[in-house]
């Protein structure tokens, strides 16, 4: 005990000292590898939770990796010792909060990775101390809000990755002081991007990712559409797909016109004009002192423009560009793309970031993938949507191993043969929407280990076989909306860490929680609207599961379609007892007032045990356990009872009404059955015995009329208990002519060694009893005839008839002699002495 106390106190003292003193060299705890004079410090999975306790490495510049540790909260000055770090990886730490000043001291930091954590907000003081940051990655978090001024100090920030979060809007002027060239906001909740305050500050961007947001294609999206139409062709901008209103659902924003977006005419036309640098109002000041002004003009009287304005040499016709924008565009246009073949009916362009080829074959009336000749080299993106492709063969993608995106949407594909995509190991996005696929099976997606986004909406899918998505361990987004699905197989999502799931507008009447929905452990968004939900007992489990989800995960509330009384009523507004009246039908005592129903729920849903139905397994196991415990307890009680009963001393029986039981005596006499002989020895010989006091026993209850009764004894002898009065009568009839012989009497009493041993054992055993005796009775053993003859031959004749009453004191001497073997010479001497008498 003292040892444990000593260890605990020592640990507390050491932890207290560690808070203020740096005692461990980081390279002694982590792995340090130098590559081309650059040190890489890998502290992944080494249980580090206080980096400020580590000494910095000796190198001038180094990369720090603290992934997969216990950094749940970053306190101020956490990395103050690592002033020469150029990159810091903090991914996969379940990081929930970053306090202001946590990055103080990282003045040389260029890259910061905060991906795959649980951050919910980026505050204005989150990035204090890292003003030289150029690359910030914060994807796959739970970020909902970004405070104004969060990036104001990051003047050199060029790459910002915020995809797959819960961001619904961007605050005004959030990017005003940053120099962004790459912005990724995919997979969020953004419905609109205003020009003023957001788009006007990202004029330097060369890559903008907009996919997988619920874009509201209304008048609010006209600024984004106008801005996209005026961007140079060599700038990569992801597709913005309309989600609302319903008549534009699934449409690309660039394919819509202004009349469709804003039919009422309010703000029906927008035009982005870049004004001369002479105007300073609301301008952006460049490092050389010039200010570029961008304003937004609304020309209500102007008729709608076409959605495809002509572009000459990357500059919008009729638009004037500032020197800054012009020089930037020219720099990208002067870059010589690699010589690569492009299929005849398609249009190819080189991606500016990695020089990968983007092949655009949209709406070229292509009947088969075999028409794409010559096959492009180093293709990263392949758009074949809007054609007439019906079948996809195994050999169609043999030369597209480097694809990152494959768009086969809006075709007439009915059959996809197995292992068609097996060689597309780098594919991250696959579009199969808008086809006529009816059935999904595992072989279709074989080989797509890195696939993250799968679009299967607007098909005729009726059945999905078990294990279909198991070959995609990185799948995060799955769109199955607008199909004909009625059910899903068990464990269909167990092999895919889905974050976003869309099952809207199918034929689901209910969805099981057990084995299906409970497998969605990383869910951030789910859409179940537009299904004919049957609001009965089968939907109670789904309702309980939805109630446990965090706010914002469910896109829209579910509405009942059947039964009729619940039509168009939101599921969450109905109580469980109303959905399932069986929950109220439980046996209970009679009460005059209604009592609230108690519903026992589990993660699998409510437990309903109808009368006569099977007993739940949990109750059965509990019952068996109770029975076993009771059985062991009863057996233990019986064992204790038996042991205690055996240890108790023999209970003395109380007297049976006879007051003489306490004075009963036990005497030994020999009784010969052959009384017809005249020999005096044949009658009886008295040997005085000590009166043994006995406890009260059952013999006390004998009637006075009973003079004796027999007990079983060793073979050849009988034990007879006689009354003391009978004994006295027998003594009166003793032959007076008989001579007294002590030896004779002893021999007659103990005719053999066995008898002697018996008496000796008997005398020794009497110590175990306290006052054992029977008052008024004697014990007699009949003598054997053969022993009698042997004694006569030894002694030589009959003795005189003398009765000697031994005194009580002589008994002890006789007793001592009986316990030892008799001497033959002594016997002869005593015999001679007696004969003389």
Swiss-Prot record:
Main location (coarse class): membrane
Keywords from the named record: Cell membrane, Glycoprotein, Leucine-rich repeat, Membrane, Repeat, Signal, Transmembrane, Transmembrane helix
Membrane topology, from the record: Single-pass type I membrane protein
Classification via SUPFAM superfamilies: L domain-like
Subcellular compartments: Membrane; Cell membrane
TM spans (from-to): 619-639
InterPro entries, per database record: Cys-rich_flank_reg_C, Leu-rich_rpt, Leu-rich_rpt_typical-subtyp, LRR_dom_sf
PROSITE patterns (UniProt xref): LRR (PS51450)
GO biological process, one term: axonogenesis
GO CC term (a single one): membrane
Domain LRRCT: from-to ranges: 213-264, 531-582
Extracellular topological intervals: 19-618
LRRNT domain boundaries: 333-375
LRR repeats: 60-81, 84-105, 108-129, 132-153, 156-177, 179-200, 378-399, 402-423, 426-447, 450-471, 474-495, 497-518
Sugar attachment sites: 81, 325, 423
Disulfide links within the chain: none
Cytoplasmic face residues: 640-837
Signal peptide (from-to): 1-18
Free-text tissue specificity from the UniProt record: In the adult, significant expression is detected only in the brain. Broadly expressed in embryonic brain with highest expression in subventricular zone, subplate, cortical plate, pyramidal cell layer of hippocampus, thalamus and hypothalamus.
PANTHER family the UniProt entry points to: SLIT AND NTRK-LIKE PROTEIN 4, SLIT AND NTRK-LIKE PROTEIN 4-RELATED
Protein family according to the UniProt entry: Belongs to the SLITRK family.
The protein's role, per its UniProt record: It is involved in synaptogenesis and promotes synapse differentiation. Suppresses neurite outgrowth.
Subunit annotation: Interacts (via LRR 1 and 2 repeats) with PTPRD (via extracellular domain).
Name by which UniProt lists this protein: SLIT and NTRK-like protein 4
Organism phylogeny: Eukaryota, Metazoa, Chordata, Craniata, Vertebrata
């Amino acid at each position: 005990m003292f040892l444990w106390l000593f260890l605990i106190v020592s640990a507390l003292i050491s932890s207290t000292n560690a808070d203020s003193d740096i005692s461990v060299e980081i390279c002694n705890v982590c792995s340090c590898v130098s590559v081309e004079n650059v040190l890489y410090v890998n502290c992944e999975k080494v249980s580090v939770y206080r980096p400020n306790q580590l000494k910095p490495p000796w190198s001038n510049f180094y990369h720090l990796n603290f992934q997969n540790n216990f950094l749940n909260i970053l306190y101020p000055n956490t990395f103050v010792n690592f002033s020469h770090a150029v990159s810091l990886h903090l991914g996969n730490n379940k990081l929930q909060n970053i306090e202001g000043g946590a990055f103080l001291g990282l003045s040389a930091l260029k890259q910061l990775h905060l991906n795959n954590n649980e951050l919910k907000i980026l505050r204005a003081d989150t990035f204090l101390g890292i003003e030289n940051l150029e690359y910030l990655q914060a994807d796959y978090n739970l970020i909902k809000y970004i405070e104004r001024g969060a990036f104001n100090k990051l003047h050199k920030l060029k790459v910002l990755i915020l995809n797959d979060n819960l961001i619904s809007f961007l605050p005004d002027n959030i990017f005003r002081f940053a120099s962004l060239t790459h912005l990724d906001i995919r997979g969020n909740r953004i419905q609109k991007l205003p020009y003023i305050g957001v788009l006007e500050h990202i004029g330097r961007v060369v890559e903008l990712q907009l996919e997988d947001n619920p874009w509201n294609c209304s008048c609010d999206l006209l600024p984004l559409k106008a801005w996209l139409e005026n961007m140079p062709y060599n700038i990569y901008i992801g597709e913005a797909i309309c989600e609302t209103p319903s008549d534009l659902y699934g449409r690309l924003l660039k394919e819509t016109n202004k009349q469709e977006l804003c039919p009422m005419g309010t703000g029906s036309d927008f035009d982005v004009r870049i004004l001369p640098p002479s105007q300073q109002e609301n301008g952006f000041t460049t490092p050389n002192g010039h200010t570029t002004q961008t304003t937004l003009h609304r020309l209500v009287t102007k008729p709608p423009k076409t959605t495809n304005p002509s572009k000459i040499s990357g500059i919008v016709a009729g638009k004037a560009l500032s020197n800054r924008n012009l020089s930037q565009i020219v720099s990208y246009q002067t870059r010589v793309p690699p010589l690569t073949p492009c299929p005849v009916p398609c249009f190819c362009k080189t991606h500016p970031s990695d020089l990968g080829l983007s092949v655009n074959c949209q709406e070229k009336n292509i009947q088969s993938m075999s028409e794409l000749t010559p096959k492009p080299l180093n293709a990263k993106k392949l758009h074949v949507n809007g054609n007439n492709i019906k079948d996809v063969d195994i050999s169609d993608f043999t030369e597209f191993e480097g694809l990152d995106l494959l768009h086969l949407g809006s075709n007439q594909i009915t059959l996809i043969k197995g292992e068609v995509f097996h060689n597309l190991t780098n594919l991250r996005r696959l579009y199969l929407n808008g086809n006529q696929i009816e059935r999904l099976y595992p072989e279709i997606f074989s080989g797509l280990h890195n696939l993250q986004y799968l679009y299967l909406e607007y098909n005729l899918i009726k059945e999905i076989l078990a294990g279909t998505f198991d070959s995609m361990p990185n799948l995060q987004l799955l769109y199955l909306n607008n199909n004909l699905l009625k059910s899903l197989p068990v464990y269909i999502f167990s092999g895919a860490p889905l974050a976003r799931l869309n099952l809207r507008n199918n034929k689901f009447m209910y969805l099981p929680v057990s084995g299906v929905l409970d497998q969605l452990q990383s869910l951030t968004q789910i859409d179940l609207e537009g299904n004919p939900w049957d609001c009965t007992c089968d939907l109670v489990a789904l309702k309980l599961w939805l109630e446990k989800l965090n706010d914002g995960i469910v896109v829209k509330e579910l509405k009942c379609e059947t039964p009729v009384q619940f039509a168009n009523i939101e599921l969450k507004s109905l109580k469980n007892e109303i959905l399932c009246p069986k929950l109220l039908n439980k046996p209970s005592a009679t009460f005059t007032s209604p009592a609230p129903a108690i519903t026992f729920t589990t993660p699998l849903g409510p437990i309903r045990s109808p009368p006569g139905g099977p007993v739940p397994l949990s109750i059965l196991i509990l019952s068996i356990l109770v029975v076993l415990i009771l059985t062991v307890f009863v057996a233990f009680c019986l064992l204790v009872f038996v042991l205690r009963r055996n240890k108790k001393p023999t209970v003395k029986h109380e007297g049976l009404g006879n007051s003489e039981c306490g004075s009963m005596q036990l005497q030994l006499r020999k009784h010969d059955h052959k009384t017809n002989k005249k020999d005096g020895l044949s009658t009886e010989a008295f040997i005085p015995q000590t009166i043994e006091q006995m406890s009260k026993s059952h013999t006390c209850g004998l009637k006075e009329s009973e003079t004796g009764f027999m007990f079983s004894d060793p073979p050849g002898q009988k034990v007879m208990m006689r009354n003391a009065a009978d004994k006295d009568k027998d003594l009166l009839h003793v032959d007076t002519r008989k001579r007294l012989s002590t030896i004779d009497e002893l021999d007659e009493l103990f005719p053999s060694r066995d008898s002697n041993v018996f008496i000796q054992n008997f005398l020794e055993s009497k110590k175990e009893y306290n006052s054992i005796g029977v008052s008024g009775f004697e014990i007699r053993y009949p003598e054997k005839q053969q022993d009698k003859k042997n004694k006569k031959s030894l002694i030589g004749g009959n003795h005189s008839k003398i009765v000697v009453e031994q005194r009580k004191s002589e008994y002890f001497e006789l007793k001592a002699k009986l316990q030892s073997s008799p001497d033959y010479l002594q016997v002869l001497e005593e015999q001679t002495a007696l004969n003389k008498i």
